[in-house]
Structures are given as structure tokens and as C-alpha cells.
Amino acid sequence: MPLTHYTVGYHDAQQEHHEICEYAKDSYDAIQHAKEDILYLKEHPSFIDYCTN
């Protein structure tokens, strides 16, 4: 299965918006990759706002 580009949007404790781009086979994997890349998201998964491609 080819990888697709996803944008994962999230906010921090100060309500500042951030985005990270990931290549993954689906949106679930993109979110999991984002959690691996940004440890803050692993601790606070509810701060993830969206995942689009």
C-alpha cells in the first residue's frame, strides 16, 4: 500500500496551534507517527485536533 501525505493538527497547553506532516498508509498511522515524533502528543492525545490528507 502506498504512503499518503497527512497533516496532523494539534494544540499545546497555551492553546497555540501546530501542525506536523506525516507519510502513512492511513490517518490512524499518521496520528501514531505524530505521537512518536512529538512526545507531548503521546502524553496528551486529546490535544490532536485533526488529521487530513
Regions found by a protein language model. Give the residues of each.
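Intrinsically disordered/low-complexity terminal segments and short unstructured peptides
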Residues: 3-6, 26, 51
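Short, mixed-charge low-complexity intrinsically disordered segments
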Residues: 32-53
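Short aromatic-glycine-(Arg/Gly/Cys) micro-motifs in beta-strand/loop hairpins
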Residues: 1-18
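A short, exposed loop/beta-hairpin motif centered on an aromatic-Gly-Thr core
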Residues: 15-29
